């Protein structure tokens, strides 16, 4: 009788064939557990050793890099670059150590947040609050790895993701912002809560990708590719129609951003590529928009901003810029990409998204994305 979990009682019973009978006082709803003492119970077995760690004993750090053990060498190489070039204090930690100290050994994305919360809370007395968190590994929506779609995916270099409570395709999302909500009682209202540090992710799955992306990042940090191209910014805006009720919304939004840049940073050369300013082909596409984007990227842009419809493989219904274009790109000047669109840079899918391809292109594409 386990009705009272703090006062479990053994009940004698008689088993006659498939019928079990026992006597118990009536008067209340009770809960019982059947234990067959003549059966063999599972025996605990050793499945591995838990390496000792002491993340709680770390001193305050400017930056934390979470990396799978097989990628630690490349993560440490990036940490050295930030120490030497930016003067940051950086610590590389493994997810297993975080789980052991912050979620009782269970893989849980919230453990990453609890680690950063520890450093953040300590800063009230020790100073030096954490400034950056880098997730050095790709993510996937199924943190438990139980769905058929992810069975063939190698998990060794993956990191967990925060998933929204909603599961419908229109309302569900993944975001790493969650790990930066460190104030007490924050993290439940993303539109209101304040991020307490900068957080980013390298969506890498292999040592080769890790090596290439660290090479790419360090090269950008060294600023060897300086020049007037870093004064160029481009704003691209989708068209609209009555069916989607957007009409000129995307163009107006992009133009507001462009005008703000022109006002606050008059030294920048602002380029505007708005679909409705170009001729639509008989196939319903905008070949001139594609050509203009390609030309501007080749000439060099500090930043390229897109506002409009999109998917994991292309911009706009007209596919003015696609994942194939990104993979085949060879321009050497690496812009920062800002994409106010749908799941262009989805990082929690089995397949690599177009936005991920921007970053993962070893010699072209882009240096970072806000998306």
Regions found by a protein language model. Name each.
Residues 1-371:
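Cysteine-dependent hydrolase recognition
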